[in-house]
Amino acid sequence: RQMCIRDSYILECHEKAELKPDKRDPSFPAYLQWFHYCEGMVMPPVNTIVVQTVLLPPDRRDETALSQAKKLLTRALEPVNMELSGRDYLIGNFSAADIMLGHACFMSNRLGCVPEEMSNLKRYVANISSRPAFDLAINMQ
């Protein structure tokens, strides 16, 4: 939720960046769906995976919880993979929905939860990763 709040604040303060379609634009409902899909569907299992593989000491990790989270994450990414068929970004043009979900997809791929069969999602992660601002942000020390 914090990511969503942060990104909503940035969007309101920097309207000229055109990272969100006008509410009258036909792509606005899809934009809202994908903007919030990240926090509602993708990040909960990502958080569980990080807790079970990084944050908890090995003796407190739960392989069942980890396995369930990985399966859930892969399932949550299936609609994203389908939506990206024939397009580079979620609503056509790059938007704040891609900022939200793009990072989550990048991390999901890094965690090994994006199978090769999800070729649209693999391509999307490559597109997001090639953006200079993403490269700068992900490699900050």
Predicted regions and their residues:
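Surface-exposed helix-capping loop/turn segments at secondary-structure junctions
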Residues: 82-93, 133-137
